[in-house]
Amino acid sequence: MLALGKLLELTLAGREPAEKTQLTVEGVRMRWLAEGALEVRPPQARDNGTDLLLSAGIHGNETAPIELLDELIRSIARGDLKPRARILFLFGNPAAMRLGARYVEQDVNRLFNGRHEQSGGAEALRACELERLAASFFSLPDRYRLHYDLHTAIRGSKIEQFALYPWKEGRQHSRFELARLRAAGISAVLLQNKPSIVFSAYTYEQLGAEAFTLELGKARPFGQNRHVNLAPLRLRLEQIIEGSEPQPDERLEGLQLFSVAREVIKRSDAFTFNLADDVENFSELEKGYVLAEDVSDSRWVVKEEGARIIFPNPKVKNGLRAGIVIVPADADGLG
């Protein structure tokens, strides 16, 4: 196996490879670009015009997706997986990965779309570098751009594997891409309705990629992910990489769609959620329930039918989103 197949090992050790460019027997070029960043380019005669960005480790303790990317990289380096797509593999926050922590000082996934310019520190610099790497990768014209940013969640979920689909004014969400996610084992998709500051929103809004944040189960340490079933996703990624993907069923049967009703913003240290600490993502909320309270008698009362909560986190910094209230959506308006 080529040494660059050990990108994860190099990243966790904080080392640069001795050789920054290597070729497989099949003529696939693997090129180390920066810490945790590897570009894979097929021979020109095999290139099918797809540019695939796969990122994981934006939160350093979300190890199942990191291990999945490691397996794909090693398969390419051994010559078992024969790409027809260009691929950029990114391990998002190496410093946090080495600590086994979500982040060191700042949540990197709140620092995109210009937010890093308003901040300082190593993680703001890393967000800037990730934007630069993605922009350079997606700079070639007339190619199909796809980005999956892979995560696991802090808490359990009533729907274990789901996706968040960014939004941009004037652009339709793609039925084909939703069908592709369903075939990859994703059970639900949240259709966003406003700009965002996460990595997938940057590549979707600024770089024209089809981009998604994928939540793939609960965060666990390295080597403890045997209960996380990523086999359908891995198979679909291998098919996209090799250009052997069967046409997905665009009827979207079995895929639950949701839209954002509103975000719960933490305004002060007085903020409290009226939810159990271990409440799961997609837990249902009764209409009229007082969901959260904050300073100056601020209250979030559930007004929507069929409402659910995702990403409840009262420990975020003041001014940030502490949770999202979502409601069922239909497939009308998909492109």
UniProtKB/Swiss-Prot annotation:
Which cofactors, if any, are listed as required?
Answer: Zn(2+)
Q: Does the keyword Nucleotidyltransferase apply?
A: no
Pathway assigned in UniProt:
Amino-acid degradation; L-arginine degradation via AST pathway; L-glutamate and succinate from L-arginine: step 5/5
* Record keywords, A-Z: Arginine metabolism, Hydrolase, Metal-binding, Zinc
Sorted alphabetically, which InterPro entries does this protein's record hold?
AspA/AstE_fam (IPR050178), AstE_AspA_cat (IPR055438), Aste_AspA_hybrid_dom (IPR007036), SuccinylGlu_desuccinylase (IPR016681)
Enzyme Commission (EC) number: 3.5.1.96
Domain of life, per lineage: Bacteria
**Residues forming the catalytic site:** 215
**Reaction(s) the record says it catalyses:** N-succinyl-L-glutamate + H2O = L-glutamate + succinate
Q: Which positions bind Zn(2+)?
A: 59, 62, 151
Biological processes annotated in GO: arginine catabolic process to glutamate; arginine catabolic process to succinate
Q: Tell me the cofactor note.
A: Binds 1 zinc ion per subunit.
Q: One MF term from GO for this chain?
A: zinc ion binding
The record's annotation in NCBIfam families points to:
arg_catab_astE (TIGR03242), PRK05324.1 (NF003706)
Q: What does this protein do?
A: Transforms N(2)-succinylglutamate into succinate and glutamate.
Q: Record's family?
A: Belongs to the AspA/AstE family. Succinylglutamate desuccinylase subfamily.
Protein name (Swiss-Prot/TrEMBL): Succinylglutamate desuccinylase
